[in-house]
Swiss-Prot record:
Biological-process GO terms, alphabetical: cellular response to oxidative stress; ceramide catabolic process
Signal peptide range: 1-25
One GO term describing the cellular component: endoplasmic reticulum
Reactions performed catalytically: an N-acylsphing-4-enine + H2O = sphing-4-enine + a fatty acid
Disulfide bond entries: none
UniProt GO molecular function: N-acylsphingosine amidohydrolase activity
Protein name, entry field: Neutral ceramidase 3
Described function: Hydrolyzes the sphingolipid ceramide into sphingosine and free fatty acid. Promotes oxidative stress resistance.
Chief localisation class: secreted
Gene3D superfamilies: Neutral/alkaline non-lysosomal ceramidase, C-terminal domain
Name of the top EC class for this enzyme: hydrolase
Outcome of gene disruption: Increased sensitivity to C2-ceramide induced cell death.
Organism of derivation: Arabidopsis thaliana (Mouse-ear cress)
Length: 733
């Protein structure tokens, strides 16, 4: 997300293997899958995650996708879960997707049984949320980003709906170590000692995998879901220039490691070959006609305080560990950065953590044996968190009623985290603020005394909940949702819960479910960043410390208690088959959106040259060694915003197929080894360059290859036209 939501990726992992034709059986469940490209604009658009004005998209490392999974009881209820390669879900995106689904399917898919959950990548285009706070660095609303998401989610659900197949479901759990650490341990230690003593670690280590077995294909046709409770990486930092974060879509340390593990699990560690039709801009995997289709996804859970930088946080100027309580170096936060397992190579860190996930998921999949049985059901409500009355346990026994507050950001949020520090003189753990920044704040909105008291001890830096011009700066009304598949219960939350906050929520819901079902045990997991976005949810005790997560807990110290109260209501309604009060509707602010992003005016090349021309080729008769060398080629290009190449590719590696005397596609935008980078000499230049880098994998087959670039140009006197260009041939050995 943005610097106010800088956490990394924990994982919810879903893996579906299905055949596309429908058959009938006596299975308890029908299951469908879909996957569609949501990459969006690969140039000029600020990325959603760091609130860094310099992090502007300029290429593609991995294409982003929406992955839809539908589970239904035959002729009864169904749920649809969509995993989104995006920083978070957007309330506006959810509203528009549901509108489209209702137009197509009536009341079959609604906000009650559809969950849209972000992976929390910090390397995807921004500008698709509807509240001003999340649109500042993207220069307002970006229609291309928004439309790519809405279109892709809709198409993925359509695919899943049209490919329902019968099957059974298994579940398995296991411990995964050395993949995440708590980045705010001083805040975690403020939780009660007796509570902390119940857990061995200060982050959750359990991976839950759900394996779906297709009735016709048996164990070969499988579907897996995995909630991995930790965060998976958040940044790509240049070692020599640590303030520069990646501008390549889905670059490390975000969805890359998820895609890395997903791809490894999809292929058993072998190369995946894809075919691509430029004319139709459609990509599909090579597969035998009688084999099931495969889709995998990693999603977020309660990882608000979890980091993949498992080596710890260090000062880049001295090499010493950062100060413990405020994560500073010499009193400043800018020099304090976490280190991943492959330090200083962030791509290597991506590979290492992805491989660790893959190995654990593969082991759990192989050994899964417990069958999921029971009904499919769901409950959903909208809650106004700006003024929610919450009943909590009183200090002297009994109970008392407290209230949440309108949204506000504390000084500590501007300090960032060890995964992406902030700027100026902000520090984590600041419960006082300073006069200068209070003066700056008051120019925007001076919080009322009631708001100051309600948010205490948070010193308010941005009073977003009370800022309404030109329209709302932050959400007030949020969705809460429970999805049930037998004994598996998914808590869909519109934000990032810290480790202990998530534990409390899960335990509270488990207690309600167990007491209301004669002691039956349920597997309860959290799907974070779902359906909307409201930043962080820390415990009451963590809130007092005001590190990044507490300072970014919008609705005051009782935010978590509010969530627990509302989810207990949903759980009771679920068990008792009671109808849930839908609550107040969130606003649809599409008509109020403002965009300051300039359109593409024209693309040009120097006189005597053409789009697609190679400007830096491979050496003549060159040879490259697989597993060691990098092939780099440059082309005259045009702005990637002219055509998003949805379900297509900007970059392609082709291999000469002896015997057939033709070039065949091998690697494209979706492959870890291939990178498409776009640049221009200065911001308003009409000339641009595409650089394609192929890090030849060890698994590449020896042979003759070439690199091809596809693009679209907009000239001053004509409409957009497509072009392509290819490098000279070279040998890989």
């Amino acid at each position: 997300m943005t610097r106010w939501s800088m956490s990394m990726h924990c994982t919810l992992f879903l893996l579906f293997l299905l055949r596309l034709t429908c058959i009938f059986s006596d299975s308890d469940y029908l299951m469908g899958l879909g996957s569609y490209d949501i990459t969006g604009p690969a140039a000029d658009v600020n990325m959603m995650g760091y609130a860094n004005m310099e992090q502007v998209a300029s290429g593609v490392h991995f294409r982003l996708r929406a992955r839809a999974f539908i589970v239904a009881e035959p002729y009864k209820k169904r749920i649809a879960f969509v995993n989104l390669d995006a920083g978070m879900a957007s309330q506006l995106v959810t509203i528009k997707v549901i509108e489209r689904l209702k137009q197509r399917y009536g009341e079959l898919y609604t906000e009650e049984n559809v969950a849209i959950s972000g992976t929390h990548t910090h390397a995807g285009p921004g500008g698709y949320l509807q509240y001003i706070l999340y649109l500042v660095t993207s220069l307002g609303f970006v229609h291309q980003s928004f439309n790519a998401l809405v279109d892709g989610i809709e198409q993925s659900i359509i695919q899943a709906h049209e490919n329902l197949r019968p099957g059974s479901i298994l579940i398995n759990k296991g411990e995964l170590l050395d993949a995440g650490v708590n980045r705010s341990p001083s805040a975690y230690l403020n939780n009660p000692a007796h509570e902390r003593s119940k857990y061995e670690y200060d982050v959750d280590k359990e991976m839950t995998l759900v394996k779906f077995v297709d009735d016709q294909w048996g164990p070969v046709a499988r579907i897996m879901e995995d909630w991995f409770e930790r965060e998976n990486g958040c940044r790509s930092v240049d070692v020599e220039s640590p303030r520069r974060v990646s501008s390549i879509i889905s670059d490390p340390y975000d969805q890359d490691l998820m895609e890395m593990a997903s791809s490894l699990l999809s292929t058993g560690g072998k190369t995946v070959t894809r075919m691509s039709s430029v004319a139709r801009r459609v990509r599909s995997r090579f597969r035998h006609a009688d084999k099931p289709r495969f889709v995998s996804a990693f999603c977020q859970t309660n990882c608000g305080d979890v980091s993949p930088n498992v080596l710890g946080a260090f000062c880049i100027d001295t090499g010493l560990p950062c100060e413990f309580n405020q994560s500073t170096c010499g009193g400043k936060n800018e020099q304090c950065y976490g280190r991943g397992p492959g330090y200083p190579d962030e791509f290597e860190s991506t590979r290492i953590i992805g491989e660790r996930q893959f190995k654990k998921a593969a082991d759990l999949f192989t050994k899964a044996s417990e069958e999921i049985q029971g009904k499919v059901d769901y409950r959903h409500a909208y809650v106004d968190f700006s003024q929610l009355e919450v009943t909590i346990n009183g200090q002297n026994g009994g109970s008392e009623v407290v209230k949440t507050c309108p949204a506000a950001m504390g000084f500590g949020f501007a300090a960032g985290t060890t995964d992406g520090p902030g700027a100026f003189d902000f520090k984590q753990g600041d419960d006082q603020g300073n006069p200068f920044w209070r003066l700056v704040r008051n120019l925007l909105k001076n919080p009322t005394e009631e708001q100051v008291r309600c948010q205490r001890p948070k010193p308010i830096l941005l009073d977003t909940g009370e800022m309404k011009q030109p329209y709302d700066w932050a959400p007030s009304i949020l969705p809460v949702q429970i999805l049930r598949i037998g004994q598996l219960v998914i808590l869909c939350v519109p934000g990032e819960f810290t480790t202990m906050a998530g534990r409390r929520l899960r335990d509270a819901v488990k207690t309600v479910l167990k007491e209301g079902s004669n002691g039956r045990e349920f597997s309860v997991v959290i799907a974070g960043l779902t359906n909307s976005y409201s930043q962080y949810i820390a415990t009451f005790e963590e809130y007092q410390v005001q590190r990044y997560e507490g300072a970014s807990t919008l609705y005051g110290p009782h935010t978590l208690s509010g969530y627990i109260q509302e989810f207990k209501k949903l759980a009771n309604d679920l068990l008792s088959a009671q109808t849930t009060d839908p609550g107040p509707q969130p606003p649809d602010l599409l008509h109020k959106q403002i965009s300051l992003l300039t359109p593409v005016v024209a693309d040009m090349t120097p006189i005597g040259t053409a789009f697609g021309d190679v400007t830096s080729d491979v050496p003549r008769l060159s040879k490259f060694r697989k597993g060691a060398d990098i092939v780099r080629v440059q082309f005259r290009s045009a702005n990637p915003r002219n055509d998003l190449m949805t379900e297509g590719t900007f970059a392609l590696v082709e291999r000469w197929l002896e015997g057939r005397e033709t070039w065949v596609p091998v690697y494209d935008d979706d492959d870890f080894c291939l990178r498409f980078k776009w640049s221009r000499p200065f911001k308003l230049s009409t000339q641009s360059t595409a650089t394609i880098e192929w890090r030849i994998p060890e698994t590449a087959s020896p042979g003759v290859y070439r690199i091809t670039h596809f693009g679209s140009a907009k000239t001053p006197i004509s409409s957009i036209h497509h072009f392509s260009g290819s490098s000279s041939a070279f040998v890989v050995y």
